[in-house]
Amino acid sequence: MSDNNQATTNASVLTGRVVSDKMDKSITVLIERLVRHPLYGKQLRRSTKIKAHDENNVCQQGDLVRIKETRPISKTKSWTLVDVVEKVEKI
């Protein structure tokens, strides 16, 4: 038997913009991706909104964040905040 001290994870990590931070300990992240049209081959922009857990309420609207998939936290939250890649400037 081999020694397996390292825990392997298959959790996906995504990067997106925070579009809402009005909920307590939660953020809404907009994930954009490019999809090729099956017939014409044109690149189309598709987006998905994902709710993620922000334990310390560190994010604000406009931040670029990295989130990872985790166990279900609530009915709609199965993602958690990994880190803030880029903070938005306050005006």
Swiss-Prot record:
Entry-linked Gene3D superfamilies: Nucleic acid-binding proteins
Keyword Chaperone (UniProt): no
Protein name: Small ribosomal subunit protein uS17
Protein's job: One of the primary rRNA binding proteins, it binds specifically to the 5'-end of 16S ribosomal RNA.
Keyword rRNA-binding on entry: yes
Gene: rpsQ
Quaternary structure, from the entry: Part of the 30S ribosomal subunit.
Coiled-coil intervals: none
Keyword line: Ribonucleoprotein, Ribosomal protein, RNA-binding, rRNA-binding
Origin: domain of life: Bacteria
GO molecular function annotations of the record: rRNA binding; structural constituent of ribosome
Gene Ontology CC, one term: cytosolic small ribosomal subunit
Lineage, top ranks: Bacteria, Pseudomonadati, Pseudomonadota, Gammaproteobacteria, Moraxellales
Listed GO biological process terms: translation
Similarity field: Belongs to the universal ribosomal protein uS17 family.
